[in-house]
Amino acid sequence: MKYSDLRDFLRALEARGELKRIQTPVSPILEMTEICDRTLRRSGPALLFEKPIGFDMPVLGNLFGTPQRVAFGMGAEDVSELREIGRLLALLKEPEPPKGLKDAWDKLPLFKKVLSMAPKVLKDAPCQEVILEGEDVDLGRLPVQHCWPGDAAPLITWGLTITRGPNKERQNLGIYRQQVLGRNKVIMRWLSHRGGALDYREWCQKHPDRPYPVAVALGADPATILGAVTPVPDTLSEYAFAGLLRGQRTELVKAVGSDLQVPASAEIVLEGHIHPGEMADEGPYGDHTGYYNEVDRFPVFTIERITRRRDAIYHSTYTGRPPDEPAVLGVALNEVFVPILQKQFPEIVDFYLPPEGCSYRMAVVTIRKQYPGHAKRVMLGVWSFLRQFMYTKFVIVTDDDIDARDWNDVIWAITTRMDPKRDTVLIDNTPIDYLDFASPVSGLGSKMGLDATHKWPGETSREWGRAIRQDPAVKQRVDELWPLLGLD
């Protein structure tokens, strides 16, 4: 099923029993976080707080609190269908020459569809039904969550940040958290390798004395939101990818105060500029690691204009010790990553990012091993192939007889197929998430690879053990006897 805007999605979720309206007054200060956290841990519904204490704007939380709802948002009926999206992205990332005329003819509709998904620009849009400027710009009127007791200030969490570099035609979409500093200022926390930060750096190099235009959309349609967190090829815009997910072109409208184009159906849009040299200390905030992060300096975004729907909904989330909403997103997007990795490394059977590993800090890979040193090649490939894995600290590689998603299997492989000295790969001075306070230097640390595969000649001089397996005939015989044994 496809959704034209956030409200269309909410209606569909409500019809499925996947949305709960909360009419009891609830505070966005701490209380919503606790309610959403308990609900997510029970795989509960999305929550629409209709009476947030102190505000007249409803708050939407836990929207992507189950992998199934992420799949719904991407236009799929089941999480397993997300692998098809991964196969599409793998093909678009590295298209293969057609094997013949028939193959070229078969692929033609796909590429025609991609080319037809350029965004559609409207003259008028729901996101600009109300326009607030000057002294009317006041973030204090938005029910921005204050998530944890030690947080520095309320935090905008689901802001879809729209930027464009000075040398680029297409825009970048990214989700970056934003600490509220005052009536019209937030801190734009984007890590240095993210698209928004790269666009801003290029702008500062080319126009060091000019303010940088930025727009932030809150409450976009699910395909556009999820397109911003999916590994889209650099040649494909997130807006075009969202159109592919939705099955229709993404509708945009020109921002009131800049040339940026924003989602026409968004609930709220913040428009403004980052002024040269204006920085501020961000944090501390409770983060997806389960800890409060260190204070660090980031650019300040000055909001000059708020446009919104007349009856806008504020979309929010929280981050904390897994599972949280980013961890759930990671579980679902894991299925998208698998075909992309397999396109580059066909020997990969499965790839798993355990949610307990904060979505990306640990990966388990199963392979069809073909030669000595193969596991090490795969480790290095995972770290370097997609920028989503540049912060992955631990990569475990094992054989395809192991279930990557079953810790009992993985731990057995590690403890029986590894020699700690021979089979551990350590790499120093690599990029690390600055939120990782375990690293010796902010943003720079080490990585560990664990080779838990069977060892081939050249990797060991010893006879390798043979795994114990029962005789299949005996297993079948016991299957027949089992109902008679009274053991169930």
Swiss-Prot record:
Cleavable signal peptide: none
Class in the EC hierarchy, top level: lyase
Binding of prenylated FMN, residues: 175-177, 189-191, 194-195
Membrane topology listed for this record: Peripheral membrane protein
Compartment annotation: Cell membrane
EC number: 4.1.1.98
Function: Catalyzes the decarboxylation of 3-octaprenyl-4-hydroxy benzoate to 2-octaprenylphenol, an intermediate step in ubiquinone biosynthesis.
Source species of the chain: Azotobacter vinelandii (strain DJ / ATCC BAA-1303)
Annotated Mn(2+) binding sites: 172, 238
Family annotation (SUPFAM superfamilies): FMN-binding split barrel, UbiD C-terminal domain-like
GO annotation, biological process: ubiquinone biosynthetic process
Active site (catalytic residues): 287
Keywords, in A-Z order: Cell membrane, Decarboxylase, Flavoprotein, FMN, Lyase, Manganese, Membrane, Metal-binding, Ubiquinone biosynthesis
Name of the protein in question: 3-octaprenyl-4-hydroxybenzoate carboxy-lyase
Pfam families: UbiD, UbiD_C, UbiD_N
Gene (name only): ubiD
Cofactor info, note text: Binds 1 prenylated FMN per subunit.
Gene Ontology molecular function, alphabetical: 3-octaprenyl-4-hydroxybenzoate carboxy-lyase activity; metal ion binding
Cellular component terms (Gene Ontology): cytosol; plasma membrane
Cofactor: prenylated FMN; Mn(2+)
